[in-house]
């Protein structure tokens, strides 16, 4: 525990917690401080000027990260017949209908993304209490309820990341790994911010993107000047 405390203190050296940095500089600082033995995830936190308790201020979407996510994503697909075959051919890890529903109902959630064909939604809808709290409920708005299951599986496997604003008005998303180059992380962050901008709800008033911070899994956060994201693109 003492070692962890010392490592965190050392990682914070050179970071002014009151200052906001340009995106390029912030990414370099975070990468330089990712020093633990595993390949840390680079994470972005975006504070938005919305109140997600109101339906017209909800923000959610999906973004295809140009550099990929660096994660091995396990994908489950609810489909039958030819659609099930297409999902398997595209690389889905688990494919089924009633049998998959039974697995989910038992609480055995061994996947990171859940996709369904539209005709499966009456079945999947009954699993909302299990899938919903885990952020796994298929939704047409983010492309996880679709007749084109093959494309959805490929997108999920290839680095598509879902984002959704939380109760406090903040979006958290992983945008790569510490082993990525700075350029790979930068293009992923810009893609995420662009997708969040495009998902701006009609009910949003005033400043939309209020604050941005980036960090590695075990590292300190670095505040980013929001204008620098567009300026450095």
From Swiss-Prot:
<comment type="subunit">
    <text>Part of the 50S ribosomal subunit.</text>
</comment>
<protein>
    <recommendedName>
        <fullName>Large ribosomal subunit protein uL1</fullName>
    </recommendedName>
</protein>
<dbReference type="InterPro" id="IPR023674">
    <property type="entry name" value="Ribosomal_uL1-like"/>
</dbReference>
<dbReference type="GO" id="GO:0000049">
    <property type="term" value="F:tRNA binding"/>
</dbReference>
<comment type="function">
    <text>Binds directly to 23S rRNA. The L1 stalk is quite mobile in the ribosome, and is involved in E site tRNA release.</text>
</comment>
<dbReference type="GO" id="GO:0006417">
    <property type="term" value="P:regulation of translation"/>
</dbReference>
<keyword id="KW-0699">rRNA-binding</keyword>
<keyword id="KW-0689">Ribosomal protein</keyword>
<keyword id="KW-0810">Translation regulation</keyword>
<comment type="function">
    <text>Protein L1 is also a translational repressor protein, it controls the translation of the L11 operon by binding to its mRNA.</text>
</comment>
<dbReference type="GO" id="GO:0006412">
    <property type="term" value="P:translation"/>
</dbReference>
<dbReference type="Pfam" id="PF00687">
    <property type="entry name" value="Ribosomal_L1"/>
</dbReference>
<dbReference type="InterPro" id="IPR028364">
    <property type="entry name" value="Ribosomal_uL1/biogenesis"/>
</dbReference>
<keyword id="KW-0678">Repressor</keyword>
<comment type="similarity">
    <text>Belongs to the universal ribosomal protein uL1 family.</text>
</comment>
<keyword id="KW-0820">tRNA-binding</keyword>
<dbReference type="InterPro" id="IPR002143">
    <property type="entry name" value="Ribosomal_uL1"/>
</dbReference>
<dbReference type="InterPro" id="IPR023673">
    <property type="entry name" value="Ribosomal_uL1_CS"/>
</dbReference>
<dbReference type="InterPro" id="IPR005878">
    <property type="entry name" value="Ribosom_uL1_bac-type"/>
</dbReference>
<dbReference type="GO" id="GO:0003735">
    <property type="term" value="F:structural constituent of ribosome"/>
</dbReference>
<dbReference type="GO" id="GO:0022625">
    <property type="term" value="C:cytosolic large ribosomal subunit"/>
</dbReference>
<dbReference type="InterPro" id="IPR016095">
    <property type="entry name" value="Ribosomal_uL1_3-a/b-sand"/>
</dbReference>
<dbReference type="GO" id="GO:0019843">
    <property type="term" value="F:rRNA binding"/>
</dbReference>
<keyword id="KW-0687">Ribonucleoprotein</keyword>
<keyword id="KW-0694">RNA-binding</keyword>
């Amino acid at each position: 525990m003492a070692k962890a405390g010392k490592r965190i203190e050392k990682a914070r050296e050179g970071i002014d917690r009151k200052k906001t940095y340009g995106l390029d500089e912030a990414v370099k600082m975070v990468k330089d401080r990712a020093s633990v033995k595993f390949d840390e995830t680079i994470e972005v936190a975006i504070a938005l000027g919305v109140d997600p308790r109101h339906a017209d201020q909800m923000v959610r979407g999906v973004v295809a990260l140009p550099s990929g996510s660096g994660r091995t994503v396990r994908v489950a697909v609810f489909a039958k017949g030819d659609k099930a075959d297409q999902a398997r051919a595209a690389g889905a890890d688990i494919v089924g209908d009633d049998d998959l529903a039974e697995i989910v109902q038992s609480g055995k959630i061994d996947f990171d993304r859940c996709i369904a064909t539209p005709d499966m939604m009456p079945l999947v809808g009954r699993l909302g209490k299990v899938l919903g709290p885990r952020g796994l409920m298929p939704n047409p708005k983010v492309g996880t309820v679709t007749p084109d299951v093959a494309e959805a599986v490929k997108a999920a496997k290839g680095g598509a990341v879902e984002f959704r604003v939380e109760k406090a008005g903040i979006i958290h998303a992983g945008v790569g790994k510490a082993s990525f180059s700075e350029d790979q992380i930068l293009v992923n962050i810009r893609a995420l911010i662009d997708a969040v901008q495009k998902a701006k709800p009609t009910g949003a008033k005033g400043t939309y993107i209020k604050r941005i911070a980036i960090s590695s899994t075990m590292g300190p956060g670095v505040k980013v000047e929001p204008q620098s994201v567009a300026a450095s693109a």
